[in-house]
From Swiss-Prot:
NCBIfam families referenced in this protein's UniProt entry, alphabetically: InhA, PRK07889.1
Family per similarity comment: Belongs to the short-chain dehydrogenases/reductases (SDR) family. FabI subfamily.
Oligomeric form and interacting partners: Homodimer. Homotetramer.
The protein's Enzyme Commission number: 1.3.1.9
Phylogenetic classification of the source organism: Bacteria, Bacillati, Actinomycetota, Actinomycetes, Mycobacteriales
Listed GO MF terms: enoyl-[acyl-carrier-protein] reductase (NADH) activity; trans-2-enoyl-CoA reductase (NADH) activity
Record's function text: Enoyl-ACP reductase of the type II fatty acid syntase (FAS-II) system, which is involved in the biosynthesis of mycolic acids, a major component of mycobacterial cell walls. Catalyzes the NADH-dependent reduction of the double bond of 2-trans-enoyl-[acyl-carrier protein], an essential step in the fatty acid elongation cycle of the FAS-II pathway. Shows preference for long-chain fatty acyl thioester substrates, and can also use 2-trans-enoyl-CoAs as alternative substrates.
Catalytic activity: a 2,3-saturated acyl-[ACP] + NAD(+) = a (2E)-enoyl-[ACP] + NADH + H(+); a 2,3-saturated acyl-CoA + NAD(+) = a (2E)-enoyl-CoA + NADH + H(+)
Superkingdom in the source lineage: Bacteria
Chain positions of site Transition state stabilizer: Y157
Name this polypeptide is given: Enoyl-[acyl-carrier-protein] reductase [NADH]
Length: 268
């Protein structure tokens, strides 16, 4: 992957721990030559310690996608990090809700407030991020969001599946709005990865039931995938994201690239 992203300036959102998909995207992007700006929400000191584990140093700025001031000043703050006159070549949206009702409660029991907030954070924020950053993106740039195939009702995933369906629709509109700027917008639909978010689902109020559902999901995914699946290895997903951030898919926008080793194409 060396050189694939040489000279590109990329903003990556969503690093929480070193198990985060966003962390591995950042790692692979740096190894491919990218200069990064990272964003974090809450617990910035903790996130900074995680960021310090990356191969290269990268600035970390605060971003709460529910905070209008954060969004309104984002382009200015990013420019402060990459230098006046420089622009971004890529943006990674790897933000999802941690609201209790989204995934770790029975579907019908989810509070409206959790669902509303969760869909805003997980889906609407893709449009908010694009709106904030398009003015400082170079033509030929790429916006990539993280997806999880929502075409079926996933056990224990509940309203997060609905949020991902919303994200897929938002992505199509972002692609349309970004097109005149010469910027592409796509999603990567990953198979299940053992991140902090997944651990939260397993450890939620469904308890043993959710843990068993996730275990069955993991086993079923590996069995369906023609080339197998490893929930502990996010690197193949990160490489797919970096391919979309590169110049090698200039005619691809408004769509979804699957990084699930083919599991979504198989019935059994």
């Amino acid at each position: 992957m060396a050189g694939l992203l040489d000279g590109k300036r990329i903003l990556v959102t969503g690093i929480i721990t070193d198990s985060s998909i966003a962390f591995h995207i950042a790692k692979v992007a740096q190894e491919a030559g990218a200069q990064l700006v990272l964003t974090g929400f809450d617990r910035l000191r903790l996130i900074q310690r995680i960021v310090d584990r990356l191969p290269e140093k990268a600035p970390l700025i605060e971003l709460d996608v529910q905070n209008e001031e954060h969004l309104n000043t984002l382009a200015q703050r990013v420019t402060g990090e990459i230098g006046e006159g420089n622009k971004l070549d890529g943006v990674v949206h790897s933000i999802a809700s941690s609201e209790t009702g989204m995934a770790d409660q029975p579907f019908f029991d989810a509070p409206y407030e959790d669902v509303s907030k969760g869909i805003h954070i997980s889906a609407d924020s893709d449009a908010s991020l694009a709106k904030a950053l398009l003015p400082i993106m170079n033509p030929g740039g790429s916006i990539v969001g993280m997806d999880f195939d929502p075409s079926r009702a996933m056990p224990a995933y509940n309203w997060m599946t609905v949020a991902k369906s919303a994200l897929e629709s938002v992505n199509r509109f972002v692609a349309r709005e970004a097109g005149p700027h010469g910027v592409r917008s796509n999603l990567v639909a990953a198979g299940p990865i053992r991140t902090l978010a997944m651990a939260g689902i397993v450890g939620g109020v469904l308890g043993d039931q959710a843990a068993e559902q996730i275990r069955l999901l993991e086993e079923g995914w590996d069995q369906r995938a023609p080339i197998g699946w490893n929930m502990k290895d996010p690197t193949p997903v990160a490489k797919t994201v970096c391919a979309l951030l590169s110049d090698w898919l200039p005619a691809t926008t408004g769509t979804i690239i699957y990084a699930d080793r083919g599991a979504s194409t198989q019935l059994l």
